[in-house]
């Protein structure tokens, strides 16, 4: 490995789908598009059945995980950063966000030609066992993380 070959002290973090108020205007990921629409009071639009299952982690939890890895991780090891309680399909993610924002989920399914550019990954779930062995635990469920995100980005958190 690189660590052994060059005698460096390094650890690796493999982040799952990280979400939160850190989303940028140029972010084109589906979850960022859902969030922008929900904040605008518009329906969340799915471009697929939303059956793909992913691990999610709220940005504040991910930051804490990175700190745990930096302080306690073993050199040469890789750690999955994921919340084992926040595994959901894209549709479940969208429905949770829509419910919190008071909007609906609608579908705009692409043509076969358009679908060719879409991801074919159906399951992207990470196990955070090694990270949890360092003592790290997430503080936010998917719903809590989305609720905090909406409050922060809408300015409610400042009131």
Q: What are these language model-derived features?
A:
Residues 1-22:
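Conserved beta-loop-beta element that borders a ligand/cofactor-binding pocket
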Residues 34-46, 99-112, 129:
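A short C-terminal helix-loop "cap" of Rossmann-like NAD(P)-dependent dehydrogenase/epimerase domains
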Residues 59, 78, 89-92, 114-137, ...:
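Conserved C-terminal active-site "lid" loop/helix of NAD(P)H-dependent oxidoreductases
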Residues 72-116:
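Mid/C-terminal beta-alpha module of Rossmann-like enzyme folds, strongest
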Residues 142-159:
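Amphipathic terminal alpha-helices
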Residues 35, 59-67, 143-147:
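Short, amphipathic alpha-helical "lid/cap" segments that border enzyme active or binding sites
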């Amino acid at each position: 490995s690189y660590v052994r070959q060059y005698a460096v002290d390094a650890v690796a973090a493999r982040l799952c789908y990280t979400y939160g108020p850190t989303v940028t205007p140029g972010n084109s990921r589906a979850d960022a598009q859902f969030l922008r629409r929900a904040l605008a009071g518009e329906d969340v639009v799915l471009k697929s059945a939303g059956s793909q299952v992913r691990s999610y982690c709220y940005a504040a939890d991910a930051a804490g995980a990175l700190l745990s890895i930096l302080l306690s991780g073993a050199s040469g090891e890789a750690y999955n950063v994921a919340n084992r309680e926040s595994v959901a399909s894209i549709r479940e993610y969208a429905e949770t966000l829509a419910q919190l924002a008071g909007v609906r989920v609608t579908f705009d399914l692409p043509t076969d030609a358009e679908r060719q550019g879409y991801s074919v990954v159906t399951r992207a779930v990470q196990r955070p066992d090694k990270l949890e062995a360092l003592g790290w635990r997430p503080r936010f469920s998917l719903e809590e993380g989305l609720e905090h995100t909406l409050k922060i980005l809408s300015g409610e958190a400042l009131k």
